[in-house]
Structures are given as C-alpha cells and as structure tokens.
C-alpha cells in the first residue's frame, strides 16, 4: 500500500512555546547567518544592541555583504546599502534585510555519544554527504519593506527567498505525498496585554486577521488606547 506521509517540521522557534534544544543546550531551528549585520552595534545609550540590517541605520550594516563578494566592480558593497532594488538604492522608506538557515536543526540526526537517533521519528539528513547540516538545508533571504505613502503606510511587505542548498529534492509530485509547503506562525499579542486576542480567516479575501476582544490596548505606563485589526496574507 501507499506509505505514510513523512512530515518533517522545519522549525517552531518561538520563544518557550516552540523552542527545541539539543542535549547540550544548542538551539534547533532557524538561526541568522553571520556577516549580514553589525554584531558590535551600540545603541544611543552606549549599550551593545545588534539588530537586523536596516536601511536607515548605517550602524546596523556589516563592513561588507557576503552575498555581494562576487560583484566585479565593488566586491562586498562596502559602506553601501544592500538593497533589493540595487546597490545603495533606497526605494522603500524603510527596508530590513537578514539571512537565516535551518542547518542547526539537528533533532533528526544521530547522537554522536550514544549513536542512537535523537528523535523517535527517525533520522533525516538533507545532505547525506554532510551530517553536520540539519533541518531541510534551507537558506532564506528575508527582506521587509515599508512605505510612508498613505496607501501603504500601515502595511509591511515581507519577501522570502528560500533556497534548497541540500542534496534532497523536495519537489511536489502528482501523488501528493511529497513537497514543501510554506506557512507562518503569527502571535497576535495586540495592545501590550494578552489573554483576550482572537483570530479568524476570511476565505473570500484570503486573509488571516486578528483583533483584541475589547478593542482596548494598554501602554506600559497604564494608559489605555483604542486598537484596530491586524491582517496577514500571502501574495
């Protein structure tokens, strides 16, 4: 008969709710690649505070961009913004950029000490020739765009460019028992106070949206304010 469907969760790295750790305490999940932000960035108070690279904050940029080293005219684009629209191009009013991979998600590997599978679901290596790579061997370049234009001022556009760097082929087949499906976890913690959030899906508009039960938010100082709705959709 037809074999059971193999489901390999890539990651649920959401604080304590989905965090998975190895026996030695290492995080299993998506982690940022080094070199795409300034790891020694200090904030205005003189405190070490690295952030993802932001187009309006030069202190968040790395000294060069690893993905631009092959540029023949300006290898690494040093001191230039690594913009989606080109070198030093600021099309959006604010653009963020970071790169992550799931190589550290080794929960489906073999424990080097016991030589036993770490997971009850078995062993999976996305690149059998390299057992140090976990997850699905996926690398994702993420860009976030915001514009101040009144038609888009309340919207963040997020572009995910996902690359399979491993040796396994995840292409969908006609039998429907293989392939990769993209999803997103959203935490509708609206209004700085949780416990009364709701979410729903509008099938006609193809939008997931969330709202606060009483429509009232609370500032850290205790003052209250009216809340709106927030929505999420794949384009």
Residue ranges with predicted function:
Residues 1-235:
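A long-range scaffold signal marking pre-active-site subdomains of enzyme folds
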């Amino acid at each position: 008969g037809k074999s059971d469907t193999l489901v390999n969760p890539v990651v649920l790295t959401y604080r304590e709710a989905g965090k998975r750790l190895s026996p030695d305490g290492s995080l299993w999940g998506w982690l940022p690649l080094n070199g795409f932000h300034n790891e020694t960035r200090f904030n205005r108070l003189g405190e070490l505070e690295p952030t993802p690279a932001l187009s309006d904050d030069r202190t968040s940029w790395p000294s060069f961009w690893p993905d631009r080293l092959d540029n023949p005219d300006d290898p690494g684009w040093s001191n230039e913004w690594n913009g989606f629209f080109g070198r030093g191009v600021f099309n959006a009013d604010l653009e963020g950029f970071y790169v992550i991979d799931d190589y550290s998600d080794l929960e489906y590997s073999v424990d080097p000490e016991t030589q036993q599978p770490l997971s009850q679901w078995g062993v999976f290596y996305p690149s059998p020739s390299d057992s140090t790579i976990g997850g699905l061997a996926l690398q994702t370049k993420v860009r976030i765009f915001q514009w101040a234009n009144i038609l888009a001022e309340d919207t963040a556009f997020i572009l995910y460019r996902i690359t399979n760097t491993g040796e396994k082929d995840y292409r969908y087949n006609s039998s429907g028992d293989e392939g990769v499906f993209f999803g997103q976890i959203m935490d509708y913690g609206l209004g700085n106070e949780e416990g009364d959030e709701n979410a729903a899906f509008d099938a006609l508009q193809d939008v997931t949206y969330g709202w606060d039960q009483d429509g009232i938010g609370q500032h850290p100082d205790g003052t209250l304010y009216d809340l709106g709705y927030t929505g999420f959709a794949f384009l």
